[in-house]
Amino acid sequence: MTKKSFLKYLLIPTMTLVIAYPILSPLAQKSAEHQPAAHKVIAYYFHTNTRCSTCMKIEAYSKEAIEKGFPEEIKNGTLEMRVVNYERPENRHFMKDYKLVSKSLVLVNMVNGKQTDWTNLKLVWQLTGHKDAFLNYVRKEVRSYLAKG
């Protein structure tokens, strides 16, 4: 192998790396920015096609407890609130996943994108007539799940 051909093999990969780095670097940064949080809590409010006033109140109070109680956690992605109609075909698996028998607020603990445990906050039904107690109950349970991280 001549000195010239040796340099050709040595320089081409180096030049490719130098050229590709500025192009790939922002993509790598964006990819890292969109990685799921190592620990995350998802609060699901599950409802059906039929929505009574109590069910609507549970959803509204749940959103208020979470959105006003944990704005930083929502912003940084460690807490998320999802409202899901579990009667829709694509969501029916949730009935089995979380043993749903009625409208429910369920907290799910996620670690590295995998569910580790969950709990159904069953007291929300008894607390709908006591807004402050409802908000405190939900926030206490969410705090407990956030502390698992």
Can you describe what each PLM-predicted range is?
Residues 1-31:
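N-terminal targeting signals for export/organelle localization
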Residues 37-68:
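Local sequence-structure signature of Cys/Sec-based thiol-disulfide redox active-site neighborhoods
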